[in-house]
Every structure is written in C-alpha cells, then in structure tokens.
Amino acid sequence: DIVLTQSPASLAVSLGQRATISCRASESVDSYGNSFMHWYQQKPGQPPKLLIYRASNLESGIPARFSGSGSRTDFTLTINPVEADDVATYYCQQSNEDPYTFGGGTKLEIK
C-alpha cells in the first residue's frame, strides 16, 4: 500500500497568514501525465469535503485561497490567506493505486 505522511500534524496560523501542509507518498502517485493526489477538509461531525483534485485542480465552489502543487511523491496544500472558517483537519489522499489511502491528517487552528 502507498503510505502518505503529512506534516505537520497540527498547525496554528494567524488570520490572514499562509498555511502550508505537506504530504509525502512512499512511492510515486503519477500516472498518464497526472498526479493522483487529492486534498480534503473535514470539520467535526461532517464528511470530508474535496478541495483539490489531481494535485492542483480546484474543486467547484472552493475559494481560490486554496491551492495545491506537487508531483510524484511530494505535494503541498496552501491556504492563503487563512480565514476563521478554515479551522478543520486536512487530509491528502491518493487514488493512483488500490487501495486508495489517506494521510494521517493535519489539524489547522487559529493562533
């Protein structure tokens, strides 16, 4: 199975500042010219919400404050600027190889 390692596990950012979350895969998640890495936001009591698909594509309805980058094994989710509503846990997920796997999550808090 592909192991996804997120860092940091938790992050405290001031309102209006930038939050950066990293995800490293144990092997490449690239195929056919695409990176099959996705980012989700989860708030307590709610299902995960897709933010970014295939590394850098913004899901419909998601603010452009969210962006994703990376390829092969190293990926980044950036939130800039951070707003109060962004308090949540963020997960990376790969869909290049079965079983699809998630990172351990990064909890974002406001400083």
Swiss-Prot record:
Chain residue ranges for the region called Framework-2: 39-53
Where do the record's region annotations for Complementarity-determining-3 lie? 93-101
Q: Name it.
A: Ig kappa chain V-III region PC 3741/TEPC 111
Q: Does the keyword Transcription regulation apply?
A: no
Where are the residues of the annotated region Framework-4? 102-111
UniProt-annotated stretches for the region Framework-1 = 1-23
Where is the organism placed in the taxonomic lineage, from the top? Answer: Eukaryota, Metazoa, Chordata, Craniata, Vertebrata
Return the annotated region ranges for Complementarity-determining-2: 54-60
Annotated keywords: Adaptive immunity, Disulfide bond, Immunity, Immunoglobulin
A Gene Ontology biological process term = adaptive immune response
